[in-house]
Amino acid sequence: MGIKGLNSIITEHVPSAIRKSDIKAFFGRKVAIDASMSLYQFLIAVRQQDGGQLSTETGETTSHLMGMFYRTLRMIDNGIKPCYVFDGKPPVLKSHELDKRTSRREETEKKLAEATEEAEKMKHERRLVKVSKEHNDEAKKLLELMGIPYVNAPGEAEAQCAELAKKGKVYAAASEDMDTLCYRTPYLLRHLTFSEARKEPIHEINTEIVLQGLELTIDQFIDLGIMLGCDYCDSIKGVGPVTALKLMKEHGSLEKIVEYIESGEANNKWKVPENWPYKEARELFVKPDVIDANEIDLKWTPPKEDELIQYLCHEKKFSEERVRSGIKRLQKGLKSGVQGRLDGFFKVVPKTKEQLEAAAAKAKLAKKNAKGAKGKVTKRR
C-alpha cells in the first residue's frame, strides 16, 4: 500500500526532489528492485488480447515470467544491472493491513460473481491478482538461469532494497511504494519496471532533497509517513496530507502531536486511534529486519542458455526464436555492462552544510515559482 498522500506532498512542496528521466539516464547503475511489486505489475499488465493472463495449454500462468524476462532484458539493454529482492515474513504489525486486504478480496469476489458485463468482470479479476509462493519460486528460478542476482529478504523487500542502496551496493531502490523513502534509501526509482509502451518516464526521488525541502529530519519524515497512514497502523482520523505536514512542522514529533490532540487544544477535530502503535511502527522503519548489505555479494553471471531454453520454451511454451534472441541481448548487455559511469571514477564527497542549504533554497524557489505560474493567464498572440 505504501504511504497515502506522500507523493503529492513531495510533488507540491519539493518538486525539485523528483527528476523524470528516460531509462537511458541510468546506464551503468546497479538497482535493487522490489520483486513482489514487480511481479504484481506483470500479472496485471502482461495479458493476452482478450484480457486474460498469459498461460500454458495446461492453464499455468506465465504472465509473471514473460514480464520478468523482457522487462529485465530492457534494463540490461540500457546498461542497468538489476538485482531483485523478494519479501520475507511480514512484521506482526502488518497483520491488520493484511486482514483488511483479505476482506477487500472477499468483497471483490462477490462483485465478480454478480458481474454481468465483460469489462466489469475483467476489472474485478485484476483486483483479485495476488503474487503466490509459486510465482516467486518460478521468478527466482528464471533469474538464476538469466544470471541476475536476487536476495531473499528476512522481512520487507523495500527495507532490504533501501539497505543495499544505503551501503552503496546499488545506486537506488526501485519500488512503487513510497514507504521505501522512510527506510532511508538515498534514491527511490518509480516506474522502472513499467512497460515501454506506456511511455512513462522513470521518477527518481532524492531523499536528501526531500528532507531539506520539507525542513524535516529523517525521524520527523518517518513520523509524517506514519501519520499519513502506512501498512503498520491506521492514520489519525480526519488528518490529511496538508494537516499532517502542518502538525509535524509545528510540533516536531508524533508524541507531541498526540499530546496536543488529546489535550483538547485542537477542539476535538481529530481522533487518535485507541492503543495506536505508532512507536512500534516507527521502530520498523528505523530498525527494519534486514540482512546487512556488507554480507551480501551481488554477482551478475553469464546466462545458462540451454537451461533457459528448456525452462522457458519446452516447459513454459515461450517462442524459442524470441527467447534465443533475448539470450543474445542478455549476453551482450552483461558483457558490455562492465563499462562504468564516468562519475564512478571519482570519490563521492558528502555535501557541505552550505550546499544543502542552497538545495533547500532552490526547492523553495521552485515551489514559489510553480504557485506563481498557476495564477498567470497566457494571452494568445
Curated annotation (Swiss-Prot):
Lineage: Eukaryota, Fungi, Dikarya, Ascomycota, Saccharomycotina
Residue numbers binding Mg(2+) 1: 34, 87, 156, 158
Stretches for region Interaction with PCNA: 338-346
GO cellular component, one term: nucleolus
Gene giving rise to this polypeptide: FEN1
Name of this chain's protein: Flap endonuclease 1
Pfam family, one: XPG_N
Family designation: Belongs to the XPG/RAD2 endonuclease family. FEN1 subfamily.
Molecular function terms from GO: 5'-3' exonuclease activity; 5'-flap endonuclease activity; DNA binding; magnesium ion binding
